Amino acid sequence: IYEPHLDQLFERNIKQGRLTFTTDLASAIEKAKIIFLALPTPPGEDGSADLSYIIGVAGDLGKIIKDYKVIVDKSTVPVGTADKVREAVKKHTTIEFDVVSNPEFLREGFAVDDFLKPDRVVIGTSSEKARKIMEELYKPYVRQGNPIIFMDERSAELTKYAANAFLATKITFMNEIANLCEKLGADVDAVRGLRAGRA
């Protein structure tokens, strides 16, 4: 998938020393206050999300964190995953940390623009400390007045699924309206204008 301007962002931030890559998890998180988990959750044979990558990394984090961290789940995950991540980290540490659900709403081919100018940022946390840290992180990206929406972790996890389902419902609905317009000789573009009203 081609993402316009992504290559320039990579080059600029690598040259300026703001973006580096490593396979050494311990050194990667040593100075980080916020750790983003953006891991695959492929469907299993029964269709459920495979959380083994997320839970595995969470366990590894528990073994190596030395000070407070905010662990942010960006992946599309089932409701209750933040609790599982929290438990996986807790098995290996007594150090304070918080788990946040921060689902992404990026469109393919528009990911850079959607990230830099989000129409909304959803943050699920029950921790006031994590809330303040996440608010500070996203402040530069919501200057145009688009909201940061705070809620609990479970609600944030469900929000991603709800948004996906709502989009699919809108597309299906408009396809049905287009079929109806074709059969009745109506103009689908004129009918589509109903979205602008309060109907």
Regions found by a protein language model. Give the residues of each.
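Structural/interface elements that position substrates and couple domains in central-metabolism enzymes
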Residues: 1-199
